[in-house]
Structure formats: C-alpha cells, structure tokens
Amino acid sequence: FLSLPELAASEGGAPANFGLLDQIAALEWVRANAAAFGGDPERICVFGQSAGAMCIGALLAAPRAQGLFARAILQSGAASNVHPPERAARVCAVFCEELGVSARDGRALRAAPLAAVLAAQARVQERLRGELEPPAFQPCVDAALLPELPIDAFAAGRAARIPLLVGTNQDEWKFYAVGDPKARALDAAGLLRRFERALPGCDPAGRPWAARVIEAYRAARVG
C-alpha cells in the first residue's frame, strides 16, 4: 500500500491500491471456483483481524468489490484506516527519502532490493509514529478504486449492504504497547489525540467520534 503515481502510471493508469487489487483478484478467483470445491459462491464470507479487518473495511466501500462476498467479519479493525490523498502522499515522500530513490523513477523503485525496501519501510513507520495513526502503509482514496473514505461511505449508506460481525480481541493492544514506549506513556489527553487522528469529525449530533469511542470502550471495560 504505497501511493506512488509513477508505479500507477506504469500499470496503465491503475490506482495505487495494489494491495486491494490483489485481494479483489483473489476474491474473484474464489467466487469463480468455489463450486468446484463444493462451496457456494453466493455465500462467501470474508474474515479479517487487525490489518485484515481494515482491508475488509476498505473493500466494503470499493464499488469494484461489490458482490464478491456475501458477509464479513471484522475483528480489531475498522473502516477508518484509509489515507486521504494528502496523507498518502506524505507517506510516499518519506518512503522515497528513506529508500534514496525519486518517486518519479519507476524503474529504480522496481529495481530496489527487497532488503532495502523492507528497511526503508521500517524507518518510515518509526519516523511517522505520532504524526500519522499507524500503520503508515494503508489503502488510500483514489478516483478509480476507492472514491471516498470508507467511514464516509458507511455513513452515507453507500457501502456494501451485507451482514457484518464486528468486534475486538481482548487485550490485543498489549501486543503493540510492548514495543511502543509512547503508547505505554499515553495519558488521557494523548489518548484522545491519537483517537482523533484515526477518527476525525463528529457524529450527526455534533459529538466528536473519538470521544464517543473512548467512552464506549470505558463503559464496556469497567476498571
């Protein structure tokens, strides 16, 4: 998930959401071949946890993915982890800086050794920690595949209308907090700021989404 215009152009103008395109291709294959394995192509259920749930949240708002699955399960991930174009451009710029390659040089980007790409990716995550809600590499809004933020598509009734099971995994945050001193040191104000990056805006009644979600978590996990 790296919004690089040069790579998109080299693919005939395809959007930069190559990760989502891979998932859509896999779902198309499953739908086309499910019957051969005794399955029902009209009853496909997708299940994702953490980043997998975030991707499903994006697919639910992608018109091209409509009809490929009939129900979905999202655990510890939501439809809010998608970059607007300006945030995706920021991640792209920092990644190219770390890799030492111009964002306009598609050939050099494709030729970069895997080890260098992975090392640059790790440095980007660290550089942008605290500036952007992790993970830094996420799907992004584009005109071809994901025309709007999924959370907005849900609010407007434009996301896929299928049965959903949504939940969280108990104590999952501890896994991330172990390796993130900043997360372990969060106070109430810092927690609110972090949620505001992930859930900007307000509900129809004018209350910030971030504050509402924090209240819901506290009410469900007393003590």
Regions found by a protein language model. Give the residues of each.
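Serine-hydrolase-like catalytic core of hydrolytic proteins
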Residues: F1-A103, R123, F154-D180
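Acidic, glycine-rich loop-and-strand cores that form catalytic or ligand-binding grooves
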Residues: P113
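Substrate-gating cap/lid region and adjacent catalytic-acid/histidine neighborhood
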Residues: A116-G223
